[in-house]
Design a protein with these regions (language model features):
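Helix-rich C-terminal or lid/interface subdomains of diverse kinases
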Residues: 29, 34, 121, 160-161, ...
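Short beta-strand segments
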Residues: 49-52, 89-90, 138-141, 199-202, ...
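ATP-binding pocket architecture of kinase catalytic cores
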Residues: 26-156, 160-161, 168-171
Length: 327
């Protein structure tokens, strides 16, 4: 912890109406790849989490501007349907202060029965998230402009922005950028089936799912890191929920999701949309290695593991039938 971090934390606590003298510890948290994340422990044992974005001049992808605006929107929305997540304490131009959720990131110490029960519980929570509707489609941060009146307009804007980032950073991709654009465009008509903007977290990999054991039995303690959220097609959440895999293989999750009222139909049009969303996430994972300036080993791992998934998603777009794209 630096002296600057300590003083910044005290200043933000004071602005939030919390006595800064109650700050007992300020320590960095692992896992953040864009924002600085710190845990603030108060003298009464209360834990808060503080997020601070990088300088505005730092390299990044277009959709990453004002991520904390989107994150606060996610937590406020999740609270309306009683999904465990951080509570927003205070927001500012350059910070987000929130409560800390109990538990540790989902890991490999769970038994198969515990895994199955938690996946079913997670399915129910995600179904509740998808009940929340928004005022329009897209990123509420305004990073790519105002919310759009329809999903096709919003998602094609999101996709084009990522491809523009690939060109701008000269990022390596397993297929040429223009070919990726043409392939995706062939499935854009399937987006027109989505008519209601729903809450999508879009980053629900195990690292962002906290597991708590309040009475010995594991329960989900919180869904965190909602900074990638957008208003759109709930089907898009299935990508990170089955990162580098296939959500249709996760029978426990789908059972819990459907039992809680979630709709999970995998007809050809849905599979085309899902392939689009998979390609979108895997493009981001490949492209962001450039502005993040990750090391050679991390870049090589991403190419080895993620690039084949991007190719498979693009192939699936064609496999599930090309639509009557209008561009």
């Amino acid at each position: 912890m630096t002296e600057g971090s300590w003083e910044r934390a005290r200043r933000i606590l004071a602005a939030a109406g919390l006595p800064p003298d109650r700050l007992a510890r300020c320590r960095p948290l692992d896992g953040g790849t864009y924002n600085t994340v710190e845990e603030l422990l108060l003298t009464d044992g209360t834990r808060h989490v503080l997020k601070v974005p990088p300088p505005r001049t730092a390299p990044g992808m277009r959709h990453e501007r004002e991520l904390l605006v989107s994150e606060a929107e996610f937590y406020r929305s999740a609270a309306t349907v009683d999904v465990p997540s951080p509570r927003v304490v205070a927001t500012g131009d350059r910070h987000l202060l929130m409560t800390a959720c109990p538990g540790q990131s989902w890991n490999g110490t769970l038994t198969p029965d515990e895994q199955s029960a938690l996946r079913a519980e997670l399915g129910g929570l995600v179904a509740r998230l998808h009940q929340v509707t928004g005022p329009g489609f897209g990123y509420p941060s305004g990073a790519l402009g105002p919310l759009a009146p329809d999903w096709r307009t919003a998602f094609t804007t999101m996709y084009d922005a990522v491809l523009d980032d690939a060109r701008r950073y000269r990022a390596w991709l397993p297929r040429p950028v223009d070919e990726v654009a043409r392939t995706a465009r062939a499935a854009y008509d399937a987006l027109e089936e989505v008519t209601t903007p729903r809450l999508v977290h879009f980053d629900l990999w195990p690292g962002n799912i906290l597991v708590d054991r309040p009475e010995g039995t594991p329960r989900i303690g919180g869904l965190i890191d909602g900074e990638r959220m957008f208003w759109g097609d709930p089907l898009a959440d299935f990508v990170s929920l089955a990162l580098l895999g296939d959500i249709e293989d996760d029978t426990a999750f789908l059972s819990g999701y459907r039992k809680a009222g979630g709709r999970a139909d995998f007809d050809p049009a849905a599979r085309r949309r899902l392939a689009l969303y998979r390609s979108y996430l895997y493009l981001i994972m490949l492209i962001e290695t450039v502005p993040r300036a990750v090391g050679d080993d991390d870049a090589a791992w991403t190419r080895k593991v993620v690039a084949p998934q991007l190719v498979a998603a693009l192939d699936d777009i064609g496999r599930h039938g090309a639509g009557r794209s209008k561009g």
